[in-house]
Structure formats: C-alpha cells, structure tokens
C-alpha cells in the first residue's frame, strides 16, 4: 500500500515537449487517469499541448476517473461545495497548512523561470503531493460508498 509519484520539472519552456513525452512513456494498457476536474482541465490541457507539438498520441485515450463528478453525486447535499480542499476538510479532517492555491501555481513557476531560484517550486511540489494523497483517499472512500462497504 504505497503511492509512487513522479513529477516532471521543466527547467524552461523548451523542455515542455520532452516532459510531455516522458509523461506519455509512463502510460500503458494498465494506466488510468485519476483526477479532480481533470476531464475539463488536465486532460484537455495536455492534449492541446501535445497537439501544439504535432503529437496526437492515442496514449491519452485511457480510462479516466474524474473524482469531482463522483464527489458531487455523493456529497453535494452534505457539503457547502465540492472543492477538493472542502472535501479534504469535511470528509477526512485534513486542512492544508501553507498551501499555495492552485490559481497561483503558474505565477510561482514563472517566478522560478525568471529568477532561477527553485524556492517557489517547493510549494508546488507539496501541493501536488497533497493532491495525490487526497485523490487516493477519495478513491478509496468513494469505492466504499458506492459498494456499500
């Protein structure tokens, strides 16, 4: 029972295609996307970036489990909203400390690019790590609720 996570760092934007291709190399017939609003954001974003580089890989056409939709179906009547951090707090008692809000992540990365200081990347890495841990917990809880466990 462990989570293995790989995060790719592009030291500059010229490495974007290499990062995307490294991501695709990890996908195989046993892969699935598990996201939170990834159906509307992450997967289309990745697909658009690949398309920009002339790569129309079919590797993104794998099963996709967007937990936002399950969360809305299961908990929207019990919670004030179905934001990831609301569910973390209300369903799991987790409250992120010192987390960088997702909308600021591009600014943190751009600061890294312009200043060459890796400091702004640390909160991004921690944010991503917490997202992954939360999604694994959500998946387990959703599975239990759907199956009556």
Describe the predicted segments one by one:
Residues 84-148:
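Acidic, Mg2+-coordinating catalytic module of metal-dependent nucleases/exonucleases
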Residues 3-90:
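Conserved DEDDh/DEDDy metal-dependent 3′-5′ exonuclease domain
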